[in-house]
């Protein structure tokens, strides 16, 4: 997701969830909250030059809930990597399952 310009996300949603409409979709994206754990990363900077944005856990969960409401999916969000009690895991994942 983070490699897309934010204005392209609605089109991405349409293509993936409405037109292709696979039974299962697995998406991962950085957890912006975790960036404080990278001492060399300046405040507000993105982890990679090709990232267009990075979402907090709440922002990702809100977007995932929107996708589910709009396209008939259920989602389970979780972290990937060692989880910090305050900022969560470095990467977040959503496993979307098409409702039947």
Stretch-by-stretch model annotation:
Residues 1:
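Conserved P-loop NTPase "ATPase switch" module shared by AAA+ and STAND
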């Amino acid at each position: 997701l983070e490699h897309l310009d934010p204005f392209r996300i609605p089109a991405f949603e349409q293509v993936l969830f409405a037109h292709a409409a696979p039974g299962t979709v697995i998406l991962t994206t950085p957890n912006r909250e975790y960036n404080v754990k990278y001492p060399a990363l300046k405040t507000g900077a993105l982890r990679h030059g090709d990232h267009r944005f990075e979402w907090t856990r709440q922002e990702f969960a809100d977007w995932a809930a929107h996708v589910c409401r709009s396209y008939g999916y259920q989602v389970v969000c979780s972290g990937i990597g060692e989880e910090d009690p305050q900022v969560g895991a470095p990467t977040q994942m959503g496993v979307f399952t098409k409702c039947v």
